[in-house]
């Protein structure tokens, strides 16, 4: 039997499809999301409706974004979900979540079992709309969740950690084994909750500057920042900010990265693109 076939649908590798089928895990995720009528619930990648059905049962309306044309068509004809659903058959990377929030008249509650092959770029896309998002609950590769929650001085700490924690409070919810999916992925999975900060703990003047600094630092994470960021900061400037030039990218806190970004914004601002 082909283990890529589930409920008559052949899982497509190019879409990174792994379908959740463990009832206990599904119920645990839905309980964590706790959807309520009247909320602007948005699911990314509903697939074969493992989460869509139990979430939809609690709602009058649900918005879903599904790239796979066949799966979108199945949802349209779903026996009880169909009338409740607003279906966008498109790539979530092209969705303007700000416009969607404006249409629905409130901040979005976004959730989904994200395709692991696009989860990181999709998270960065969503971070740019955090002013339009109330919270997010995602099933991700466990290694990605570890990176999201990691603090300084750990191998998992990287650019994703800094940017996620700049925008959101990051809370791990539960771990999920490969056996909970069809076909089973080759990696462990985990569910994470991301809640955009109501007030930014470390506001930056220009997010592009923070993005540039973290990219350059972590692209050369084994180098000390006196070397990896020598095109941006002198040793004297780092020392004046109270940041040890002998530290590596993984030793620097989110607050310190934001401090560095604001210094650069004030003293060497990026040109408008």
From Swiss-Prot:
Reactions catalysed according to its record: adenosine(1518)/adenosine(1519) in 16S rRNA + 4 S-adenosyl-L-methionine = N(6)-dimethyladenosine(1518)/N(6)-dimethyladenosine(1519) in 16S rRNA + 4 S-adenosyl-L-homocysteine + 4 H(+)
Record keyword Zinc present: no
Location within or outside the cell: Cytoplasm
Binding site for S-adenosyl-L-methionine: 18, 20, 45, 66, 91, 113
Pfam family, one: RrnaAD
Catalytic activity, EC: 2.1.1.182
Molecular function (Gene Ontology), one example: 16S rRNA (adenine(1518)-N(6)/adenine(1519)-N(6))-dimethyltransferase activity
Cellular component GO terms held in the UniProt record: cytosol
Keywords linked to the UniProt accession: Cytoplasm, Methyltransferase, RNA-binding, rRNA processing, S-adenosyl-L-methionine, Transferase
Disulfide bonds: none
Signal peptide: none
Major site of localization recorded for this protein: cytoplasm
InterPro entries: KsgA/Erm (IPR001737), rRNA_Ade_diMease-like_C (IPR023165), rRNA_Ade_Mease_Trfase_CS (IPR020596), rRNA_Ade_methylase_Trfase_N (IPR020598), rRNA_adenine_dimethylase (IPR011530), SAM-dependent_MTases_sf (IPR029063)
Family as reported in the entry's similarity comment: Belongs to the class I-like SAM-binding methyltransferase superfamily. rRNA adenine N(6)-methyltransferase family. RsmA subfamily.
Primary role: Specifically dimethylates two adjacent adenosines (A1518 and A1519) in the loop of a conserved hairpin near the 3'-end of 16S rRNA in the 30S particle. May play a critical role in biogenesis of 30S subunits.
HAMAP family found in the cross-reference section: 16SrRNA_methyltr_A
Name by which UniProt lists this protein: Ribosomal RNA small subunit methyltransferase A
